[in-house]
Swiss-Prot record:
Species whose genome carries this gene: Rattus norvegicus
Subcellular location: Membrane
Residue ranges, annotated region (Disordered): 302-331
Residues spanning the membrane: 30-50, 57-77, 89-109, 226-246
Segment forming the signal sequence: none
Protein name, as recorded: Transmembrane protein 255A
Lineage, top ranks: Eukaryota, Metazoa, Chordata, Craniata, Vertebrata
Family the entry assigns: Belongs to the TMEM255 family.
Amino acid sequence: MHQSLTQQRSSDMSLPDSMGAFNRRKRNSIYVTVTLLIVSVLILTVGLAATTRTQNVTVGGYYPGVILGFGSFLGIIGSNLIENKRQMLVASIVFISFGVIAAFCCAIVDGVFAARHIDLKPLYANRCHYVPKTSQKEAEEVITSSSKITPSTRALRNLTQAVKEVNCPQLSRGLCTPRIRGNTCFCCDLYNCGNRVEITGGYYEYIDVSSCQDIIHLYHLLWSATILNIVGLFLGIITAAVLGGFKDMNPTRPALNCSVENAHPTVSYYARPQVASYNTYYHSPPHLPPYSAYDFQHSGVFPSSPPSGLSDEQEPQSPSPSPSYMWSSSAPPRYSPPYYPPFEKPPPYSP
């Protein structure tokens, strides 16, 4: 009984601790998923800004932002659920895992592209020229128009005038004259004459830009997307680990508290009568004689003479019943079992 009460008291003390651990895990899960969602939005924003900066440079750094953002959104919803918490958190962990892989790949691709294929030295030296859209129209009209002057000669002359503003003396030859589009930032120092492969390692033209300063912005956006993908990589791993430890935790149900509260009156109710009945039975005199109603109904079969060996003086003082209630030799066996309390003399037996 003592042990059961101690166990009930220890279980009552452990309920606030379990609820505190559950709330602490839930709070940590929400914190990391919200942080991952913010990083995912930044990755998506920077990646879209970088990939829409130019037409011929494609950036894939925004794909991890979409996957990680969706996984973190599922994690926030699953952390606030009770019934379907495990299913939502498992789906969130799966999406976050794919987002971590995508962030790792995109960080490598964008970092290598920004380091090897974008050279800012000609831009800082003002050796790149921006060709507006009007120059492209004039060049196309010159090339496609038919006149007495041969198209090649007129095209070379107009393109040479346009290229002279770029300060590219090697482009004055006919074989090395490029076709420059409108809204293009062209860097002649990075262009290999007559070779389509850029051995110098950089893009020599950037199409559909507003100015050559957009190339510098593109370079910074690529490195920003690379850094954010690395941050999303490690934060996604941490978030998946936190959600994996939280998905199997359940809050303490109210039914457990009710069962613990009902255990106290049950123990006190059954414990006290047992002790009272034990003391009353063994330490108090009996309220009824150890004879049944059958003995009193058939009292005529008993002899009226007192038992042998007892005098008249001892008869009133004896705690035994009256001699008229004694059994005779021809009487049937007794109905009640011959049990006598301790410290009391049993009645004599007469054959």
